[in-house]
Amino acid sequence: MVTDSAVTAPAGTESSVPAGLARSWLLVPGSADGLATRAGASGADVVVVDLEDGVAAADKGRARRALVAVADAGLRPWVRIGDAASDEWRTDVALLRGRDLVAGVVLAKVETPEHVRRTVDALDGALPIVALVESARGIEAALEIAEAPGVVRLAFGSGDFRRDTGAADDPLALLYARSRLVSTSRAAGLPGPVDGPTVRREPAVLMDASRHAASLGMTGRLCLREEQVDAVNAALSPTGDELAWAFDVLDTLERCGIRDGSDLPRIARARAICGAAEAFGIEADAAAVHISDYAS
């Protein structure tokens, strides 16, 4: 049982991966037992203390007190709060306003840029916002939401989107929604969006879903359990072989220069791979052998 007494967080366990690059976003209910330990030791790039759907109505107050206790223990997780049209939202922003409790806010059920603006204004612009898009209205307003001041990333609430639209839990059925979030994120100058979670527990299902998300241009995923984190991080990270390819491309560019316009996409991809690998602490595969695209 979560109590309001002081808790001690594990030392040295918070991720240094910035939110714009974060792959794994672990949702931990604010009412969960051992919240500070889970938040500090999960291995996720970002831990999100859930005050919204993951917490029963009767436990909301206890979850908010637990979030404060986590902050008192020295951790700064993100927090998912109620949607901007709800009474819970008012209570959540009142808790956060003017206090150094969290690193950022995942705003639930965003359907219009006004939902973001209300939240940013209520928090005096002090916290970055990940806008969780979970409905047909939200998907169709995705560009305006992405361009709202304060938004640093979009995320896909796939479960609620399926409930809203009647879509199946199938990659093809959700292809439009995911692709629209990718495209609008790019158009708004944001990083790739965060995909919704995999509910099923089979590791192969999780890995396939994560690779599918990556193939569309999504660069993060919500996780529901700690055991999902490693697979999500692996699926959304450059491999050692890919990093070796990127080094080869950039090295050859330095020696030979650009031959034609078709080189530019490869160079951009190589630089993106190197940047992500540096953030994630990934080293090139020394055994990888690549033949330069520019070699004479």
Give residue ranges: language-model regions.
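Expand to "…catalyze enediolate/carbanion chemistry for C-C bond making/breaking, isomerization
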Residues: M1-S296
